[in-house]
Amino acid sequence: MENLKQLQERVAVSDGREKADLVIKNGRIVNVFSGEIMEGDIAIKNGYIAGIGDFSEAEQIMDAAGEFIVPGFIDAHVHVESAMVTPAEFARVLLPNGVTTIVTDPHEIANVAGEKGIEFMLEDAKGAPLDMFVMLPSSVPATEGEHNGETLHAKKLHPLYKHEKVIGLAEVMDFPSVAKGSSDILTKIIDAKKEGGRIDGHGAGLTSADLNNYLAVGIRTDHESTNAKEAVDRLRAGMFVMLREGTVGRDLLQTISAVSEKNSHRFCFCTDDKLINDLITEGSINYNIRLAIENNIDPITAIQMATINAANCHNLPYLGAVAAGYQADIVFLKDLQTIEISKVLKNGQVVVENGARNEAAFEKKHSETFISPKIQHHLSKQDLELPLTNDTCYVIGMKQNNLFTEKLMEQVNVENGKFVPSIEKDLLKMAVVERHHNTGCVGVGIVKGFGLKEGAIATTVAHDSHNIVAVGASDEAMEKAINYVTEMGGGIAVVDETGKVLHDLALPVAGLLSNKPYEEVERDLAGLLKAFNQISNAKGFDPFLTLSFLTLPVIPELKLTDQGLFDFATFQIIPNEVN
């Protein structure tokens, strides 16, 4: 927060009575308010823009050499934990991509560690040259039909609003509780309103009629549109619509046609969940901008969606524009087609130049670890058995690069009254093992789409309750993979049919995050993918993030929890067998 002296100094710079800290000359400024490209000097004082016009007196003069000057990009909805690195490391990845602000929902770590997890994320982000605003998790757990690590009722959340970086209530996922008028979720919404915060939606699978429930209680955003019709429905209902392009949720190409000259001010961009390797190779919000431009969105409109629209969406009044009184978060672009970045300023300081970070701007941190209690009993093959009385079963139909699944009915192989995986039919066994309270609960189901030839994969990243989830071609391989990630205190492992571990990634922070530099995490993810390709014929998708979302019951159609097979349409556990 600024003080009186800083405001007085900024005013003095704006009218030429004092020197600026920095003046940027010869840039072509993208005005996100008028949609114009303008010329003028940008005077910066104490991390804020003091004015745009004719300025020469400064401690430092920077020549933009005709490059385009745009505001720092804003990711309107992201789960940092999906990158499997800490917030401090996340900043190191995002800033070269021009992202200077994120709005995050730390519900992944909250599902494991409760308030302590949220506080850890806020503390770790301190000192990083990235604004990380937090929306408090609204749905921990996501539903009542599973075990997670902690439950966050309204009373537990309310004190966290005192933190200056907490700005609202995160995606309200438990739609049935909203529709029923559940006192806990409505109290959370009331508390957010009292604190002046926004309330994010999660309208996966909701019809235009269902949206009335959302809007009636004050939910004002949504990021779950998977096609243009859904995006328009949300727009017409009065929502800000976030167009998502992540690792699994790749929806931008299906939704971008909803954007028009008349309505673009109500659209912004988000990544939601994106792995570190995709952030490095594709980018973050800069990638969303490029995709939009490639699909006939005007470049300035796309930049508005990535900046001022996102700031307006979350009521961040001093972010999202290159204008007097705004935070000096500035990106230099070589052109407005490829969005090639040459320089990034955060609070008026150069943090990235020609792709290289100014490492002095990034604090070095070693994160403490939250290690969930290990499963006390050694998992056996018997825990993974799936008894059947007939051979027609509900099967989770995995869709590549899509968070939705299909509710399939398939004839499966049964031997001695138990399900047997079929490599030929690509009908594999999936299991979710509770890891937080030593309940011994194991949900077992059948999944199609992973193409395993042998072996198994297991991970403690399993949205949103983050139990252990595994998929395998045999019980023996699954048993080995599950016990291995348990013994290592959280992480991901790929094993072959002999039980040999082909590659692993340790995630000691809540079983979700590495405490290593992101470069090491990227190398391990590449190793995991190489190992997966040794045991699978399936290509063209990320198997680990895909697997982690097969346990999220608040996205259609069929998912698996530690309690069993969850049907989104009825919002309850159903038998594996078709009656």
Swiss-Prot record:
Coiled coil: none annotated. It catalyses: adenine + H2O + H(+) = hypoxanthine + NH4(+). It comes from the Bacteria. Pfam families: Adenine_deam_C, Amidohydro_1. Its EC number is 3.5.4.2. One of its GO terms (molecular function) is adenine deaminase activity. Transmembrane segments: none annotated. Its cofactor is Mn(2+). Keywords: Hydrolase, Manganese. GO terms for biological process: adenine catabolic process. Belongs to the metallo-dependent hydrolases superfamily. Adenine deaminase family. HAMAP family: Adenine_deamin. NCBIfam families: ade. This is Adenine deaminase. It comes from Listeria welshimeri serovar 6b (strain ATCC 35897 / DSM 20650 / CCUG 15529 / CIP 8149 / NCTC 11857 / SLCC 5334 / V8). The gene is ade.
